[in-house]
Each structure stands twice: as structure tokens, then as C-alpha cells.
Amino acid sequence: MTAFAPVWAVGLMTGTVLDGNVDIALIRTDGETVQAFGPWTLAPYPAGIRPLLQLALDAARAWAFEGPEPPVFAEAEAALTRAQSAAVQAFLASAPAATLGITPSVIGFHGQTVLHRAPTAGQHGATRQLGDGALMASLLGIPVVHDFRSADVRAGGQGAPLSACYHAALLRGAAPGTAVLNLGGVGNLTWMGPDGAGPGGMGPGRAGPGRAGPEQVSPDTALIAFDTGPANAPVNDWVEQHTGGAMDRDGALASAGRVDEARLARLLRHPYFTAPPPKSLDRFGFTAAMADGLSLQDGAATLTAFAAAAVGRALDVLPHRPARLAVCGGGRRNPALMDALRCRTGAEILPAEDLGWRGDAIEAECFAFLAVRTLRGLPISFPGTTGVPAAVVGGVLNTPNPAARPKEGFAN
């Protein structure tokens, strides 16, 4: 493979929990390893963006990939793209990025997932992220890679999770027996076997043809990733419905409640948890309605325990159960969830920072990393991560067109 000099890349990520922010991170990478970690930030959206995105999410659920897209998609996509473009411009113009004189070669723009449908035996998968890569490239004058998931879905994959490729690069420096658990709206797990070469041109291995049983994957698979189940989304929605708050801050409500173990056992009988990976979920695949009839505190406790127990079930299907989980994403800041993971997985639970990683920046770093892989023509999804039949080079590259720069600039 021709040598590729590492470049600076910006990654942008907004999660399905709609916290009103965009994560922005800079890394220097060749798409296989990370040479340097640059600055990162959490940039709040202007007023009005979050409610508009919520309208788009609500419209997406009613649309369900049937018929024309809801009109609110175009409005929300333009507003989100301009808001994130303005955030990137401010980020690059401020210290330390400006002080270091960093000029990115590419931006990885994930956009906002409004609907995701995993493929089933009788139905093709589908996915929709709001984000206009061509508009962002024109506004910033920097190449932009967006629409990372569609190519995988068209090829028969789940379209998620895509973070495995980057997690594998991070795991190269971790102790054996470590897996990565990301806790956003949905949880996802990345496991790399002892023969995993990491994300080179074809590093993560092809899924083995045989399995020991319907609940286990082949031990010769080098890289496995899948969604474990719900994470923060149901409990966040539960708290918002009952208090107007955005989340169970510090797990205070869950800590004050009692888990309904009988209900939890019923929830864990859902067929998703016995299906072999690769598999993926939409943010609304499991909802706060699972706790209906419980008190505020008991509902929070039960939904939190469900998220942790789902991870425990996920570990059961791996070829080798990991000794420890490096946890990234917002869920690692919830002490009740972290304690529940320790209780219900049997693994050592460590925040990503204990491994020297930046837990709040990992998802944004991931899309910077994937953007560089797209530039190089390297795959970003694999049979063991999304179930796609063969590795797929995903993402759409948009090059700047100064003549097409909108006169209104960053204004909505």
C-alpha cells in the first residue's frame, strides 16, 4: 500500500440524545493509527436548533421511510449544517487550534441521525442522517466527508456501529482483554480478538462461516461490533417526561429507586438480546414506556439496570468474555449506570480516561479518523462490525466550490 502522510482532520458528532451540542475534535492520522490528538470542544447549538431537530425526529418516526421525506427535514438539515459549520469556524479560529496553526485537510461530518432501520429477513435496512456535506464544504472551504452509513446499508449491512474501526486503533495500545463500550442514546460494544490486526486496509477479519450456536459468534473473527441495547435514551426520556429535565444527573434518581427485577427479567427476554451480532438499533427501538406504572425513581432505576444488563447479555455472545470494559460516551458520567455495569457484567468497568483516552471526544475523533480513511479509499465497515458481506468504503467526499458558497453564509 502506498504510504500516506498523516493529516489533521476534524470530526463532528451529535448524538441521538439531543443534548443541544456538537462534539468537535481534531486528530492527526493516516486512517490506520493516530499520530497526535489535537484540541476538542463541546459547542452548544444556537437557540432553536434543538427544538427543530426534535420536530425532525418526531416527523421521521411518523414517516418510517414511506413516501416523500417530511418537509421539516430540509429545514432542519440546512440549519444544522450552518450551525455546525459556524462552530467549526469558531473552533479553528480560537486557541489552541489557531495558536498551533492547524489547518485540517478534511472534516468528518456525521450529521444527525433521525431514523435508522436495521435490515431483517424480509426488509432492507434504511438510515437517514441530516447533514449537507456540500454546503459545509462550500461554507468552510475545506473538503467534507458525510453520509457515512448509506453505502453500508445499500450493500446489505446494518449501517452501524461505525465506531469499531476507530476503537480498534485505540485498542492497539490497551491491555489484552479490553473491549470498548460506548454509552450514548444506544450502547455499542467493540471487541478485538487476539489476532485482530486493527484497521488497516482489510485488517478487521471477515466473520467466520460457522458459529458455536445461535447466541455466539465465531472465535476466528478479529473485530466484532454491535449495539448492545438501549443506554441513555430511555432514562433521559423518562426524566424529561416526568420532570422536564434532560437527564438523570449523576444517576441521583436511579440511586434513590428500586429496580423492578421481575419487569427487568421480562424486558431481557426481548429477541434482540438472543440474536447474534452484527446487529443495530434505532434510538427509539426501546422507549421509556418500558417503565410505565413505576415511580419516577423506580423507573429510572429499572431503565438504568436494563441498559447495564443488556451489556451483560452482549458479553455472553463474544468468543471470549473481556476482562474489562473501557467506557466512553455520556453514560460513563452516570455513577448509577457505572455501578450497575459492575454488578451486571462481571467485568472491570473503567472510564475511558483511565486508559489515557478522551472519553467525551472519542465519537468526534472517530469521524475524523473515518474521513481520512474515506480519502484513502480504505473501508470503514466490515463483516464483523455491520454484517456487510464484504468490507465497504463509506462516506461521500465533498470538495469546496467557492462559486457555490451561499451568500447568506452561516445564517439560517
Task: State each model region's role.
Residues 18, 353-403:
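Glycine-rich phosphate-binding/hydrolytic loop that grips phosphoryl groups
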Residues 242-322, 335-342:
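A contiguous, well-structured pocket-lining segment that forms one wall/lid of small-molecule binding clefts
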Residues 4-10:
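Extreme N-terminal starter segment of soluble prokaryotic enzymes
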Residues 63-131:
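Short beta-strand-loop/turn "lid" adjacent to the catalytic site in phosphate-handling enzymes
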Residues 101-110, 320-331:
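Short glycine-rich phosphate-binding loop at a beta-alpha junction
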Residues 96-103, 193-221, 407:
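Intrinsically disordered, low-complexity terminal tails and inter-domain linkers enriched
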